[in-house]
């Protein structure tokens, strides 16, 4: 028996090819695509402007996958963490960061992560597998049933550039005018520093935003806290940032997790400025969110303010991120912190 095709794994051109293989006209693909993403159709029977015969054929050869949250935790600041159970028993999390008129959804790209960043709780769990295109898109579809989403950041569980074969089609679906209709200016892909994959991302999706998790200004420290630096050290990473095709006046976002006593001094701020001054950039300072068993600590308020002021005074665009969702383990670096506990049955 032939395995059915999940249509949410297909971009619009791929869906056109799929239906062409069934002898169908090209415009049928656009009809089906719109039903899936603009009407949230979960069955072919809902597609009332398509003939019964075509619906029956689709039913025989394809299906429309779906994700429903197993649990939703709401933080004191309104942040929501969604726990999604996957068909194979694995789980991933997404985080909705509410902001009046411009809600941001942080989505996952992998189950676990292979990068092993020392300050990230998700990184303490080994990579189990990549998410499919459908599983990435379905996180957005599920949360969008609750609230309007304006921004997508691929900063959840996993390293997006380690799964480009599924991430790139998912983003094409996000920004397709017949799909999720998100502006490419509102989609940001984050990486810990896979330099060759940055080149591929820029080539295949030149209009999305790039965020680079930098977190250190010397190879010595970055080697210690981010093992990927041993393969792609700062010089190679920053060269890839310079080559990334930024449209218009957009900038690379450098994410900088501030670790108390390690990378939060004025000397670090000075080195950061020297390293990045020839790259159009903005800096997100992220005070470290402590978790049980971690070896690092949060920076002091004084250290955060001094670092921020040094960069601002030198005309760097810099934002110190609030620790949104930390009370529900939904803050940066905390995903999967309460996953197992959340899934345990209560007596």
Curated annotation (Swiss-Prot):
GO cellular component term, pick one: cytoplasm
Molecular function terms, GO-annotated: 4 iron, 4 sulfur cluster binding; metal ion binding; rRNA (adenine(2503)-C2-)-methyltransferase activity; rRNA binding; tRNA (adenine(37)-C2)-methyltransferase activity; tRNA binding
Compartment(s) where it occurs, according to its Swiss-Prot or TrEMBL record: Cytoplasm
InterPro entries to which the protein is assigned, alphabetical: Aldolase_TIM, Methyltransferase_A, RlmN_N, RNA_MTrfase_RlmN, rRNA_lsu_MTrfase_RlmN/Cfr, rSAM
Requisite cofactors: [4Fe-4S] cluster
HAMAP family in alphabetical order: RNA_methyltr_RlmN
PANTHER family xref list: 23S RRNA METHYLTRANSFERASE, RADICAL SAM CORE DOMAIN-CONTAINING PROTEIN
Function: Specifically methylates position 2 of adenine 2503 in 23S rRNA and position 2 of adenine 37 in tRNAs. m2A2503 modification seems to play a crucial role in the proofreading step occurring at the peptidyl transferase center and thus would serve to optimize ribosomal fidelity.
Name recorded for this polypeptide: Dual-specificity RNA methyltransferase RlmN
Species of origin: Pelobacter propionicus (strain DSM 2379 / NBRC 103807 / OttBd1)
Lineage: Bacteria, Pseudomonadati, Thermodesulfobacteriota, Desulfuromonadia, Desulfuromonadales
């Amino acid at each position: 028996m032939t395995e059915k095709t999940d249509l949410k794994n297909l971009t619009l051109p791929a869906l056109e090819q799929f239906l062409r293989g069934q002898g169908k006209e090209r415009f049928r693909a656009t009809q089906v695509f719109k039903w899936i993403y603009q009407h949230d159709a979960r069955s072919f029977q809902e597609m009332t402007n398509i003939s019964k015969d075509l619906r029956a054929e689709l039913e025989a050869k394809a299906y429309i996958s779906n994700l429903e949250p197993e649990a939703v935790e709401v933080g004191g600041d309104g942040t929501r963490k969604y726990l999604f159970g996957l068909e194979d028993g694995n789980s991933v999390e997404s985080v909705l960061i509410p902001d009046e008129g411009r809600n941001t959804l942080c989505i996952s790209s992998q189950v676990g992560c292979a990068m092993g960043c020392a300050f990230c709780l998700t990184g303490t769990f080994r990579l189990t597998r990549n998410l499919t295109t459908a599983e990435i898109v379905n996180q957005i579809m599920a949360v969008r049933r609750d609230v309007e989403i304006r921004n997508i950041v691929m900063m959840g569980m996993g390293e997006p550039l380690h799964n480009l074969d599924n991430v790139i089609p998912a983003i094409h679906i996000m920004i397709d005018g017949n799909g999720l209709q998100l502006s490419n200016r509102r989609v940001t892909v984050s990486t810990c520093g896979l330099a060759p994959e940055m080149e591929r991302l820029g080539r295949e999706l030149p209009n999305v935003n790039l965020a680079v998790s930098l977190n250190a200004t010397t190879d010595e420290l970055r080697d210690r806290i981010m093992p990927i630096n041993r393969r792609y050290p700062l010089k190679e990473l920053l060269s890839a940032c310079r080559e990334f095709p930024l449209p218009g006046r957009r900038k690379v976002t450098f994410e900088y997790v501030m670790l108390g006593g390690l990378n939060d001094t004025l000397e670090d701020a000075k080195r950061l400025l020297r390293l990045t001054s020839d790259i159009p950039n903005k800096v997100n300072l992220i005070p470290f969110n402590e978790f049980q068993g971690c070896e690092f600590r949060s920076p002091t308020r004084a250290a955060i303010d001094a670092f921020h002021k040094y960069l601002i005074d030198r005309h760097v665009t810099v934002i110190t991120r609030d620790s949104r969702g930390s009370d529900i383990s939904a803050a940066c670096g905390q995903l999967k912190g309460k996953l197992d506990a959340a899934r345990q049955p209560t007596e």
